[in-house]
């Protein structure tokens, strides 16, 4: 898979920190735990050994996943983007035309999306609808349960 992954500087650093923690702290700790469990004798009935090996497998898989994501990542600096239009990295404040409720969305790459914290993927229906729009423009987003009508009230890049 050679697709490049757009990422904010913050998202890239977060993945890098997790990778460093796994390599420098978690991996050595699990190797030590396996060695200690191995010292307890018969491995066929050694629950500690099997649990440690399972955890090691998970850690190694996550390390490979993070290395692949970071290798494909390209960091987009929001300060170098046209600030007048919604683009990757933008924080967009909208008002729901029907309910007059204000919401804020932070447009990020798919690997950084966290809906509970207002971070939505640029590939999501909301992200796709907002990209390229300007303050004052209205967008309609058709979700499975409901249609949302938003007006963009501000765009910022931090």
Swiss-Prot record:
A GO molecular function held by the record:
RNA polymerase binding
Name any Gene Ontology BP term: regulation of DNA-templated transcription elongation
Keywords linked to the UniProt accession: Coiled coil, DNA-binding, Transcription, Transcription regulation
One Pfam family hit: GreA_GreB
Instruction: Kindly indicate whether the keyword DNA-binding belongs to this entry.
Output: yes
InterPro entries reported in the protein's UniProt record:
GreA/GreB_C_sf, TF_GreA/GreB_CS, Tscrpt_elong_fac_GreA, Tscrpt_elong_fac_GreA/B, Tscrpt_elong_fac_GreA/B_C, Tscrpt_elong_fac_GreA/B_fam, Tscrpt_elong_fac_GreA/B_N, Tscrpt_elong_fac_GreA/B_N_sf
| Gene3D superfamilies the record matches | Transcription elongation factor, GreA/GreB, C-terminal domain, Transcription elongation factor, GreA/GreB, N-terminal domain
Q: Which residues form a coiled coil?
A: 47-73
Q: Which family does it belong to?
A: Belongs to the GreA/GreB family.
**Per its database record, what is this protein's job?**
Necessary for efficient RNA polymerase transcription elongation past template-encoded arresting sites. The arresting sites in DNA have the property of trapping a certain fraction of elongating RNA polymerases that pass through, resulting in locked ternary complexes. Cleavage of the nascent transcript by cleavage factors such as GreA or GreB allows the resumption of elongation from the new 3'terminus. GreA releases sequences of 2 to 3 nucleotides.
The protein, known as: Transcription elongation factor GreA
Name the species this protein comes from: Thermodesulfovibrio yellowstonii (strain ATCC 51303 / DSM 11347 / YP87)
The gene for this chain is greA
């Amino acid at each position: 898979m050679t697709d490049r992954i757009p990422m904010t500087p913050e998202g890239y650093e977060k993945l890098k920190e997790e990778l460093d923690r796994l390599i420098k702290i978690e991996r050595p700790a699990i190797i030590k735990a396996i060695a200690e469990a191995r010292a307890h004798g018969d491995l066929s009935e050694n629950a500690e050994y099997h649990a440690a090996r399972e955890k090691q497998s998970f850690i190694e898989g996550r390390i490979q996943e993070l290395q692949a994501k970071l290798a494909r990542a390209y960091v987009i600096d929001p300060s170098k983007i046209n600030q007048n239009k919604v683009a990757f990295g933008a924080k967009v404040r909208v008002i729901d035309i029907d309910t007059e409720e204000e919401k804020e969305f932070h447009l990020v790459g798919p690997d950084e999306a966290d809906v509970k914290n207002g971070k939505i993927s640029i590939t999501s229906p909301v992200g796709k609808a907002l990209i390229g729009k300007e303050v004052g423009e209205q967008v309609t987003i058709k979700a499975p349960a409901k249609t949302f009508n938003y007006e963009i009230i501000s765009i910022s890049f931090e």
